[in-house]
Amino acid sequence: DRFGRTQTFHREAAGEFSGEITGVTDGAGRHFRLVLTTQAQRAEEARQQAISGGTEPSAFPDTLPGYTEYGRDNGIRLSAVWLTHDPEYPENLPAAPLVRYGWTPRGELAVVYDRSGKQVRSFTYDDKYRGRMVAHRHTGRPEIRYRYDSDGRVTEQLNPAGLSYTYQYEKDHITITDSLDRREVLHTQGEAGLKRVVKKEHADGSVTQSQFDAVGRLRTQTDAAGRTTEYSPDVVTGLITRITTPDGRASAFYYNHHSQLTSATGPDGLEIRREYDELGRLIQETAPDGDITRYRYDNPHSDLPCATEDATGSRKTMTWSRYGQLLSFTDCSGYVTRYDHDRFGQMTAVHREEGLSQYRAYDSRGQLIAVKDTQGHETRYEYNIAGDLTAVIAPDGSRNGTQYDAWGKAICTTQGGLTRSMEYDAAGRVIRLTSENGSHTTFRYDVLDRLIQETGFDGRTQRYHHDLTGKLIRSE
């Protein structure tokens, strides 16, 4: 790139993976090994696993069809990515791959494992149509299923713990209906990559519209109240140069030959300006009130500033690691804060002046599990299999916990021995809040998910009214 950083791809010179990329060296000097496997290797591995497990091997062909509807297929798949060299941590490399992939006997992606070895994603495919995904799951979350029509288009998205959707396709419009019987219609124009949604009928009957130019760039948007906003893209770059609001007021935007914003003028006539160096780094920014902020750089191979100076002359300095991580920050008074990071880039310590430090620990999945200060006071954190924070244990041993529903929404929180609970509808909206003393607050929404009524624990009801564009116009 323009800073002299190079990403290098290493290809096998011979053998069954000849010509394939099996290694990458990034601009910071880290080397990653890409572990490839053939269909025959995966089939043999499946047979060996079955034998060691004392089960009957399942059908796993040694070869795949050379051509599919998606194109040529040589059967080679990426199975793992390893970090094999790190200039900053040469003696502390991960003992396991950063990510692993599992494949079906037909060569479809089946599972993804993170650096801790835990499964984080899984996929299921149609028995008849190779590569057609019919189910998908994040670990700890419900499985979402899909159904298709004869043309391979999704007609149903089935969500066992939330909203499900059906899709009906016509020549120039698509009708989407959710399990609450709310309907939206998307009207389209154009073909292939230039197809655009030009009109949307919302569930409440309101309509919004958009217009595009011949190459698919947005030119106008008309809201549900019939008010139109105009956009003027640059003929060559497509960058927006002017926005005119429904009341006729305009904002203008100007760019340099690198497509970087150099100035912007709002409807009120106020302007911001930006200047860049020959490498495209921001070196000066002028605010609408005329205040100037300057940015300094001491490394020609980095786009990160080493210092900033504001309109008052106050100066702040920063140092960075080769991986772009903040190592130290010195404020305008000379107060220095230093930061430590682990090999995964996560912050492990913050050191402030006067010997005050804070230390952070993470589990094998990269989740924060403990924060300890200089005096040894430690706060610990626990998570469920989906990665939701379930407990915070304070230094005195007190425990605050949270329970979640299948989709990761908090349904119960306990703090200081007091419990508060939440109930949701199928759309994921809070409909009932029960406080620590057992009193209730209920909520109602319109078909566009806008809050329209709130009844408090004292029985008093507050109603909210919105205009066609969704703006709150009255409460009573």
Language-model region placement:
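Extended charged/polar low-complexity repeat regions
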Residues: 1-476
